[in-house]
C-alpha cells in the first residue's frame, strides 16, 4: 500500500492540471509522455487504457486522469450524457469557449456538469478509480485563472466561473479537486 511519503507519478503534460493535483497531494510529481487516447464515452475505459500504456514506459505508482464536461442541451434522446463529454479537448481546440457558450444559448439550456476520473495504479496489476462530479451552468466566458472550459463553467456551489477563481478556491469546487481529494483520503488511510 502506498504511504503518503512515497512519490507518485502523475502522467500529464498539462502544468495547470499538475498545479491542481499538487495543491492537494504535494508529493506528486509529473512525467510527460505521449499516450494513446482512445475515443470512448466511458471515462474509466479511457483512464484504464492510458494507465496500461503508461505502465509500459514507467514504474508504478502512477495516476492518470480524464476530465469531461457534459452539456444537457447535447444529451441523447435516451438520456445518455451529452457532448462534448470526454471529447471536450477537441471541441475546445475546434470551436473554443465562446462557441461552447453559444451552443448552449441556441438550445436555451445552460445546464451542464463536469466530471473527472482519476485512475491510480499502485502496482502493475491494480487500478483504482476516484471520481468527482460538479453540476452547474454554462455561462459567457469570464476569468483569467483556470484553463480549458473553466471560463464558461459556473458550478452551482460558486457564484463565479472556475476560471475566475484562484487555485486554492478552484480545487475546492471543481471536479478534479473532488476526485483528487478522494484519492488523498484513500492514500492516507494506508
Mark where each language-model region is.
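Anionic-ligand binding patches
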Residues: 2-9, 16-190
Amino acid at each position: 500500500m502506498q504511504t503518503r511519503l512515497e512519490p507518485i507519478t502523475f502522467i500529464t503534460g498539462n502544468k495547470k492540471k499538475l498545479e491542481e493535483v499538487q495543491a492537494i497531494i504535494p508529493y506528486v510529481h509529473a512525467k510527460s509522455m505521449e499516450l494513446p487516447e482512445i475515443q470512448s464515452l466511458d471515462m474509466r475505459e479511457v483512464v484504464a487504457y492510458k494507465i496500461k500504456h503508461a505502465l509500459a514506459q514507467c514504474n508504478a505508482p502512477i495516476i492518470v486522469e480524464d476530465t469531461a464536461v457534459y452539456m444537457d442541451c447535447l444529451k441523447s434522446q435516451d438520456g445518455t450524457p451529452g457532448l462534448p463529454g470526454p471529447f471536450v479537448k477537441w471541441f475546445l481546440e475546434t470551436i473554443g469557449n465562446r462557441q461552447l457558450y453559444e451552443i448552449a444559448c441556441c438550445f436555451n439550456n445552460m445546464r451542464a456538469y463536469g466530471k473527472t476520473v482519476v485512475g491510480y495504479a499502485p502496482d502493475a496489476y491494480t487500478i483504482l478509480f476516484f471520481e468527482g462530479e460538479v453540476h452547474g451552468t454554462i455561462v459567457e466566458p469570464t476569468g483569467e485563472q483556470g484553463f480549458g472550459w473553466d471560463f464558461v463553467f459556473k458550478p452551482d456551489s460558486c457564484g463565479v466561473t472556475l476560471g475566475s477563481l484562484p487555485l486554492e478556491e478552484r480545487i475546492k469546487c471543481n471536479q478534479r479537486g473532488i476526485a483528487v481529494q478522494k484519492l488523498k483520503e484513500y492514500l492516507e488511510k494506508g
